[in-house]
């Protein structure tokens, strides 16, 4: 009877080992590691929760016949939680002695590299061609600034617009042909001081001839002279008329008293 039970247990172990050989992701030698407390599962991940290896595969009569201590079942869930409660996952822990020995061994093979930047002048220094620097204090640094108010800008725009309008009017006046002032000269000749009126009439006629020839300079000169003589003739004529009227009134007033 004992021989039959041992053969069955050997068949179970051989089937489990054959299944491990076909799976390359797990231990191909043995799916169970025998420890002091009994058979322990080698599946570390929780996806193998259904695989619980223990003494259940062997009949209870085998345990009683071998007089071995009671074997415990291993629950992967409790094992994973107990490890995560003390350590963080995905962290490899080493003792201080191992780390100290590694540090002593690596220190001899390490070399330190130092990067030095090029010398450049600071904001308060000035570089000369020979490579020397001169420090400048805050008093030596002068910043030229230009500021103006918005009101001044508006006034400047108004002045600029007025100047542009004046220049445009002057340009238009220069482009216009000179006037002959013929009507004013005729009035001064007939109604005012007639000698100056005749001269103004003659100059207005010369202005028309110069404009017809295209000589604008001569036409403008004749036009200015005709205007001056016509105004002077009107002024003198007006004075003569006023004087004659005053003399006549004075003469009549004397006759009335007599």
From Swiss-Prot:
Q: Which residues lie on this side of the membrane: Cytoplasmic?
A: 1-181
UniProt subunit comment: Homodimer. Interacts with GRIA1 and GRIA2.
The UniProt keyword set, sorted, is: Cell membrane, Cell projection, Endosome, Membrane, Phosphoprotein, Postsynaptic cell membrane, Signal-anchor, Synapse, Transmembrane, Transmembrane helix
Q: Which residue ranges are intramembrane, renumbered to this chain?
A: 229-249
Please name the GO terms that the record assigns under molecular function: glutamate receptor binding; protein homodimerization activity
Q: What is this protein called?
A: Synapse differentiation-inducing gene protein 1
**Function text:** May regulate AMPA receptor content at nascent synapses, and have a role in postsynaptic development and maturation.
Q: Would you tell me the Gene Ontology cellular component terms?
A: cell body; dendritic shaft; dendritic spine; early endosome membrane; excitatory synapse; glutamatergic synapse; intracellular membrane-bounded organelle; plasma membrane
Tell me where in or outside the cell this protein is found. Answer: Cell membrane; Early endosome membrane; Postsynaptic density membrane; Synapse
- The chain residues annotated with the modification Phosphoserine are 137
Q: Which InterPro entries match?
A: CD225/Dispanin_fam (IPR007593)
């Amino acid at each position: 009877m004992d021989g039959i039970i041992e053969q069955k247990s050997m068949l179970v172990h051989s089937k489990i080992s054959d299944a491990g050989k076909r799976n390359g992701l797990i231990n191909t030698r043995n799916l169970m590691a025998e420890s002091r407390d009994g058979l322990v599962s080698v599946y570390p991940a929780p996806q193998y929760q259904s695989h619980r290896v223990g003494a259940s595969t062997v009949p209870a009569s085998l345990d009683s016949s071998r007089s071995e201590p009671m074997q415990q079942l291993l629950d992967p869930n409790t094992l994973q939680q107990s490890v995560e409660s003390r350590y963080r996952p995905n962290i490899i822990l080493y003792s201080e002695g191992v780390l100290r020995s590694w540090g002593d061994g690596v220190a001899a093979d390490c070399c330190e590299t130092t990067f030095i930047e090029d010398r450049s002048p600071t904001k308060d220094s000035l570089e000369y061609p020979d490579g020397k620097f001169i420090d400048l204090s805050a008093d030596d640094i002068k910043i030229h600034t230009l500021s103006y108010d918005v009101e001044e800008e508006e006034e400047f725009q108004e002045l600029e617009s007025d100047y542009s309008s004046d220049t445009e009017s002057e340009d238009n006046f220069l482009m216009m042909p000179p006037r002959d002032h013929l009507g004013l000269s005729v009035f001064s000749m007939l109604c005012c001081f007639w000698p100056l009126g005749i001269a103004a009439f003659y100059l207005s006629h010369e202005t028309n001839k110069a404009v017809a020839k295209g000589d604008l300079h001569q036409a403008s000169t004749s036009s200015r002279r005709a205007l001056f003589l016509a105004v002077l003739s009107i002024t003198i004529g007006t004075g003569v008329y006023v004087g004659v009227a005053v003399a006549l009134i004075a003469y009549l007033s004397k006759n009335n008293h007599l």
